[in-house]
Amino acid sequence: MTQMTPQEIVHELDQHIIGQHKAKRAVAIALRNRWRRQQVAEPLRSEITPKNILMIGPTGVGKTEIARRLAKLSGAPFIKVEATKFTEVGYVGRDVDTIIRDLVDVAIKDTREAAIKRNRTRAEDAAEERILDVLLPQPRKQPSGFFAEEPAVEEKHEDGATRQKFRKMLREGKFDDKEIELEIAAPAAQMNVMAPPGMEDFASQLQGMFQGLGAGKKQTAKMKVADAFKQLIDEEAAKLVNEEELKAEALKNVEQNGIVFIDEIDKVTSRGEGHSGADVSRAGVQRDLLPLVEGTTVSTKYGMVKTDHILFIASGAFQLSKPSDLIPELQGRLPIRVELSSLSVDDFKAILTSTNACLTRQYQALLATEGVELAFEDSGIQRLAEIAWQVNEKTENIGARRLYTVMEKLLEEVAFDAKSGACRIDGAYVDGKLGEVAEREDLARYVL
C-alpha cells in the first residue's frame, strides 16, 4: 500500500492525464483513506468502509486512465470490467461474482511475481550450482581406507579450486553457447476448455481439476547454458514460493486494497418510463452488483473473499441517461460523484506535448528508428489541437482518442516512405494534409 499523500498522488497523475482536477482529487483522497484506515485500531477499523466513486463524463476524457494509473501507483490488485458484459443471474452472460474471481486471479499472479522477485538471488545461486554440477560431474566416491585418506583430501581441494574457476567463467559468460544436457521439470499438461457464454466459471473449475496432472515429473533436455540458466532460475524460484502463504497474502490484499473499475455503468440503466425486457435485465445487473458494492462474501477457487473494503469506481458518459436512472440502492452505494469536463483546444495541446508519453514523443521515437527526425513546431501543434477539437464538435465527441486518428492521417505518408532526414510539422504542413478534410463535415465523418 502506497504512503503517498493526496498532493503527491495528484502530481503523479498530472504526469499522464491532462486536466480533470476534481476527479484526480477524489481518487487521491479515496486512495489515501485506504492507508489512513490501516492506521486505525480495531474494532473501529473494520467499520470504516471505502467511499465508492461515480465518474460522469464523455468518452475519451480520462476516466479509465485515472483509475488505471491509480492502481499502478497504489500497487493494489486492480481490474477493469465493462458493465455491459454482465447479465442478471439466470440469463446467458457472465455472473457479476466473476468480477471478484478475476480480481483474485490478478492478485495471485502479482503476488507470485513479487515472491519470485524476492527469491531471485537465492534462485540464481541454486541454478548456478545445478549448472556447475553438470559442467563438473562429481567423481564416484572411492571407499575410504588407510591408503585412500590423504589423496581424498587433495582431490577435494583440487575439485573446489576447479569449481571456483568454472564458476568465474560461468559468470563471465564464457559457457553461454556451450550445450549441456540436464534434468528439468516437465511442463504440466495444459487443458483448454471451450465454454459457452455464461459457463466460464465451470470451465475454470474443470481446468483447475486437471491442472496438477503431470506436476513434479522430470525430463532430460539439451540446451545452451544461457537458456538453461534462465529456465533453472524460474524453476528454483518457483520452488521457494510457499503456495499457502501466497494465497493467504493475495486474498488479504484483495480484501483490504482491491480496486474494481466498472466502466459503461450508464449502459445498464433503465431508460424512460416503459420497462422492456432489456430494461428488466439491466435493472437485474444493477441489483446483482448491489451486494458486491455493499459488502458480501464471494467464493473463489482460492478461498472466500469479503468485498466490504474493496473500492469500487464506476464510470459512464450518461449521454442518453442520467445518474438518477440508476436504481436508488446503487446510487446510495456510490456517494462520491465527480463530473469530468470535455476537452478544450488547450487540453489537446497539452496532451500532445506535456505528458510523459505524449503522442508527439511517441511518433518521434518510432520514426527515429529509421533515421527520420520529426520536429513539431508550435504552429503545427496548435493546428492539430484545433482540428481535433473541431472534428469532435462537428461529429461524435470521442475526446482525446480523436488525436490518434488525426495523427495517423497526418503522418501516414511520412511513416510509409520513412526516408532518412528531417521532417518539420508546422501549421502549413498540417493544413495541407488535414485542412480540407477537417472543413468538410461529410469527409470528416469518415476520414477523421
Swiss-Prot record:
Alphabetized InterPro entries for the sequence: AAA+_ATPase, ATP-dep_Clp_protease_ClpX, ATPase_AAA_core, Clp_ATPase_C, HslU, P-loop_NTPase
CDD domains: RecA-like_HslU
Transmembrane segments: none
GO process terms (BP): protein unfolding; proteolysis involved in protein catabolic process
A Pfam family this chain is assigned to: AAA_2
Binding residues for ATP: 18, 60-65, 263, 329, 401
Gene3D superfamilies reported in the protein's UniProt record: 1.10.8.60, DNA helicase RuvA subunit, C-terminal domain, P-loop containing nucleotide triphosphate hydrolases
One Gene Ontology molecular-function label: ATP hydrolysis activity
Keywords carried by this UniProt record: ATP-binding, Chaperone, Cytoplasm, Nucleotide-binding
GO cellular component: HslUV protease complex
SUPFAM superfamilies in alphabetical order: P-loop containing nucleoside triphosphate hydrolases
Subcellular location: Cytoplasm
Function: ATPase subunit of a proteasome-like degradation complex; this subunit has chaperone activity. The binding of ATP and its subsequent hydrolysis by HslU are essential for unfolding of protein substrates subsequently hydrolyzed by HslV. HslU recognizes the N-terminal part of its protein substrates and unfolds these before they are guided to HslV for hydrolysis.
Subunit description: A double ring-shaped homohexamer of HslV is capped on each side by a ring-shaped HslU homohexamer. The assembly of the HslU/HslV complex is dependent on binding of ATP.
Family: Belongs to the ClpX chaperone family. HslU subfamily.
Name the record gives this protein: ATP-dependent protease ATPase subunit HslU
Gene behind the chain: hslU
